[in-house]
Swiss-Prot record:
Its EC number is 6.3.4.19. The lineage of its organism: Bacteria, Pseudomonadati, Pseudomonadota, Gammaproteobacteria, Enterobacterales. This is tRNA(Ile)-lysidine synthase. It comes from the Bacteria. Pfam families: ATP_bind_3, TilS, TilS_C. It catalyses: cytidine(34) in tRNA(Ile2) + L-lysine + ATP = lysidine(34) in tRNA(Ile2) + AMP + diphosphate + H(+). GO terms for molecular function: ATP binding; tRNA(Ile)-lysidine synthase activity. The gene is tilS. ATP binds at residues 29-34. Its main location: cytoplasm.
Length: 440
């Protein structure tokens, strides 16, 4: 492929940004930006020795998506780049269709990445300005105003955006010099979407008045990112002290801190666990309604597809969990293991472990996840209400209706892995079972 002098800066940036990347997966939409990036990668491939693959994400949102995927396939075939088209389902949540599509896109790419492979995406300088202004509109702090990082991670894989220092005009000029063909997505004209409105109505006027506006925004984003990195370093030791081996966060350790420091630590705790960054009012609710609620409460705060719970003066970030209270699972343990719902694992008979009496003739076996009333367990003289018993055994509230309960007819025999009731106790010369819960 021919090279001209104006290409040198772009090519050198690609070489520098992808140094050490033996294998690369390009997120390839067929648009201008990713078409330029693919051409650049193919240009430097001969001397770099890098392995390049490309993946098109089929969102199913545009009737032309099939033809776009075919365009991408043909272009990759021409340049001898292995190609995949990945179909995703976009389910709009509170963040809207744009955010949902982005989430689905990155999830698909993360699954598609091979061991040791680096993901490249083609966002440019103007995209950075849009991202910054959208964060400003939301009232984001330095983390949000950091916009997009040139180097970050997607799971355990490096994520590199090598074109962030170049404008769309520069990429367009490159594409025209090399007579590239690319797709124009008609949805990019729809100004109902905030990003398109900024791109078409706001940024051109700002750049016309102040030509260096995108570069200035990029510098501000970098400064915000530096401030966030500094805070990460300064708060690292405090967070390590407050965080427990199971990921829970100590509430008592947060109480004496100033609200500013407390919220900074909460944000970093959530970020470390992969949660979407909460708005300021959500952080305040987290503290007021969950952390600082009365001691006997069992508060819950939903944060997108996660929930924050409190137990024994610690905060836990958990996935949303469907209730299993009404589930009744018939079981014949001697015939086969029992697969539990919601990926909870398997129950099976074993040669060792906690023993319960085998059922008598006429007793049917079932697994349930809820019971009520007073329970008498082996090793205790007096019965306890089941809620009190769970508390005394240190079982977190979210496990109390997800722990398999063994019933014979309507009689509670055991909470598998937790306790055996007097009704399930093995008497002398009685046949017995060892039931084991293998969790996923």
């Amino acid at each position: 492929m021919d090279r001209t002098e104006p290409d040198d800066e772009l090519l050198q940036t690609i070489v520098t940004q992808t140094a050490g990347c033996g294998s690369i997966l390009l997120a390839y939409s067929g648009g201008l930006d990713s078409s330029v990036l693919l051409h650049l990668l193919v240009t430097v491939r001969q001397r770099s020795g890098q392995t390049i693959r490309a993946a098109y994400i089929h969102h199913g949102l545009n009737p032309l998506a099939d033809s776009w995927a075919e365009h991408c396939r043909q272009q990759c075939e021409r340049w001898q780049v292995p190609f995949s088209s990945l179909a995703v389902t976009v389910e709009a949540q509170n963040g809207g269709i744009e955010a949902a599509a982005r989430t689905a896109r990155y999830q698909a790419l993360q699954v598609h990445l091979k061991e040791g492979e680096t993901l490249l995406t083609a966002q440019h300088l103007d995209d950075q300005s849009e991202t910054f202004l959208l964060a400003l509109k939301r009232g984001s702090g330095p983390a949000g105003l950091s916009a997009m990082a040139a180097n970050s991670f997607l799971g355990h894989h490096r994520l590199v955006r090598p074109l962030l220092g170049f404008s769309r005009l520069q990429l367009e000029a490159y594409a025209q010099r090399h007579q590239l063909r690319w797709i124009e997505d008609d949805s990019n004209q729809d100004e109902r979407f905030d990003r398109n409105f900024l791109r078409r109505q706001i940024l051109p006027r700002l750049t016309q008045r102040w030509p260096h506006f995108p570069s200035a925004v990029a510098r501000s984003a970098e400064l915000c990112a530096e401030q966030e990195q500094l805070l990460d370093e300064l708060l690292e030791e405090s967070l390590r002290t407050l965080r427990q081996p199971d990921g829970a966060l100590s509430i008592d350790g947060l109480v004496p801190l100033s609200p500013v420091r407390r919220f900074a630590l909460l944000r970093r705790w959530l970020a470390q666990q992969g949660a979407t960054m909460p708005a300021r009012d959500q952080l305040q609710r987290l503290w007021d309604e969950v952390a600082a609620s009365r001691r006997d409460a069992e508060p819950i705060l939903q944060l997108n597809q996660m929930q924050i719970r409190r137990f024994r003066q610690h905060l836990y970030l958990l996935p949303l969990m469907p209730s299993l209270k009404d589930r009744v699972l018939p079981w014949q343990p001697t015939s086969c293991p029992l697969s539990l719902p919601d990926n909870l694992g398997t129950l099976l008979l074993a040669d060792s472990g906690v023993a319960v009496r085998a059922p008598k003739n006429g007793e049917t076996v079932s697994i349930r996840f809820s019971t009520s009333g007073t329970v008498h367990i082996v090793g205790r003289a007096h019965g306890r209400q089941i809620k009190k018993l769970w508390q005394e055994l240190g079982v977190p509230p979210w496990w109390r209706d997800r722990t398999p309960l063994l019933f014979y007819n309507e009689q509670l025999i055991a909470a598998v892995g937790r306790f055996v009731t007097r009704e399930g106790q093995v008497r002398e010369h009685q046949p017995l079972w060892h039931i084991v819960w293998e969790r996923n």
